[in-house]
Amino acid sequence: MPAPGSEQDFVVNVGDRVYFDLDSYSVRPEAQPRLDAQAAWLARYPQVTVRIEGNADERGTREYNLALGARRAEAVRTYLIQRGVPAGRIDTISFGKERPIVEGSNESAWAQNRNAHTAIVSGAPR
């Protein structure tokens, strides 16, 4: 069982990743409960800072996917700020298509690689 307030607690009990539709950076309705849980967890542990990492699938140019990943990360950041997380606790970065979580050139892999990952930067034990 992960220790409360730990990075493992966040990953296992809250969830650190939400997914996006093809060529979209709109937060999907099914992602909202996870992001609401992230915001609540971050409110409970105010010393924690996070980085939202925007990702894209392999289709499209490197430049296009870096821009799309940035918009996805910013969409999640905005959502968390609207739920009360102070802006100063959230950084963003885009990895575009450079860091796939699933290898493959099929819809299943692409769907998983279109995501925003909330990574804990500081303030929580592993």
Q: Positions of the model-derived regions?
A:
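A generic structural micro-feature
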Residues: 108-112
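Periplasmic peptidoglycan-binding/tethering modules of Gram-negative envelope proteins
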Residues: 1-49, 123-126
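A non-catalytic structural micro-motif
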Residues: 46-55, 70-101, 114-126
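Generic anion/oxyanion-binding catalytic loop in active/binding sites
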Residues: 24, 62, 107
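Acidic catalytic loop of the alpha/beta-hydrolase fold
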Residues: 58
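Extracytoplasmic/secreted proteins, especially bacterial periplasmic and envelope-associated proteins
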Residues: 30, 34-37, 63, 71, ...
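Short beta-alpha junctions and helix-cap segments that line functional grooves
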Residues: 102-106
